[in-house]
């Protein structure tokens, strides 16, 4: 009888704190970690590198099907490797993020990357970070968490992150981009951003990251144990 590899999914909008939570869960359980959003960002960056038309689904599908991407754990979470090059920092720019969100609206692009994401499900278990992990990619996941926060709070967090890295950012522009991305993600025809019916919904707007981790760990351990 085939052994079912356990999965914990963490979905939610950009900037809600999913990445930090998933890294904490992966460390606590000793499981693999999949940053599905990074896959779309890597695809977007690959399209920019290879001058592929990001508005053309036909052009993006073969690139997605043959995407050379690896995730290597490190002290800070994950190193994202594209075609042998560490692009962990490059894929986190707002330009790449917005391009990735556009690419994610294409059904055949999502299908090409769906198979790749499911291949990350290996023993002893997987923590999956994304927007449709609990609804589309791993609907049979044992634990599903939907992490949310207000657009204003997410813009504030993102601004601080970028400033710490030396980027000069405008809060209002950042807030506008987050709202636009939210609208695209929540209203796209294929796999819109929505909480799974059996997910624990956590609003992190007024919570510290430690409180989010504590609540999520308690919930996950109760189910997984």
Curated annotation (Swiss-Prot):
Q: Where is this protein chiefly located?
A: cytoplasm
Cite the GO molecular-function annotations of the record. Answer: ATP binding; CMP kinase activity; dCMP kinase activity
Note whether Kinase occurs among the keywords: yes
Name the Pfam families for this protein: Cytidylate_kin
What Enzyme Commission number(s) apply to this enzyme? 2.7.4.25
Q: Name one GO cellular component term.
A: cytosol
Name the catalysed reactions: CMP + ATP = CDP + ADP; dCMP + ATP = dCDP + ADP
Chain segments annotated as coiled-coil in the UniProt record: none
Q: Where in the cell is it found?
A: Cytoplasm
Q: Does the keyword Nucleotide-binding apply?
A: yes
Taken from the UniProt record, the cysteine pairs bridged by disulfide bonds within this chain are none
Q: Which residues bind ATP?
A: 12-20
Entry keyword set:
ATP-binding, Cytoplasm, Kinase, Nucleotide-binding, Transferase
Which Gene3D superfamilies does the entry mention? P-loop containing nucleotide triphosphate hydrolases
Q: State the InterPro entries in the record.
A: Cytidylate_kin, Cytidylate_kinase_dom, P-loop_NTPase
Protein's GO biological process: nucleobase-containing small molecule interconversion; pyrimidine nucleotide metabolic process
Q: Which family does it belong to?
A: Belongs to the cytidylate kinase family. Type 1 subfamily.
User: HAMAP family in the record, alphabetically?
Assistant: Cytidyl_kinase_type1 (MF_00238)
Protein name from the UniProt record? Cytidylate kinase
Which lineage is the organism of this entry classified under, starting from the top rank?
Answer: Bacteria, Pseudomonadati, Pseudomonadota, Gammaproteobacteria, Enterobacterales
- The coding gene here is cmk
């Amino acid at each position: 009888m085939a052994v079912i590899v356990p999965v914990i999914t963490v979905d939610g909008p950009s900037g809600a704190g999913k990445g930090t939570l998933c890294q904490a869960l992966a460390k606590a359980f000793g499981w693999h970690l999949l940053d599905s959003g990074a896959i779309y960002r890597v695809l977007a960056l690959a399209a920019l590198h290879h001058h592929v038309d990001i508005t053309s689904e036909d052009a993006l599908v073969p690139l997605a099907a043959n995407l050379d991407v690896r995730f290597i754990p490190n002290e800070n979470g994950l190193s994202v490797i594209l075609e042998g090059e560490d692009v962990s920092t490059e894929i986190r720019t707002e330009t790449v993020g917005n391009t990735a969100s556009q690419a994610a609206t294409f059904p055949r692009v999502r299908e090409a990357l769906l198979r790749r994401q499911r291949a990350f499900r290996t023993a002893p278990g997987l923590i999956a970070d994304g927007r449709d992990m609990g609804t589309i990619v791993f609907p049979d996941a044992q634990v599903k968490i939907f992490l949310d926060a207000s657009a204003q709070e997410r813009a504030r967090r993102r601004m601080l992150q970028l400033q710490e890295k030396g980027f000069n950012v405008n809060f209002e522009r950042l807030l506008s981009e987050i709202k636009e991305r939210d609208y695209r993600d929540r209203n796209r025809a294929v796999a819109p951003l929505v909480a799974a019916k059996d997910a624990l919904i956590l609003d992190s707007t007024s919570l510290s990251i430690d409180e989010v981790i504590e609540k999520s760990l308690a919930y996950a351990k109760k189910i997984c144990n």
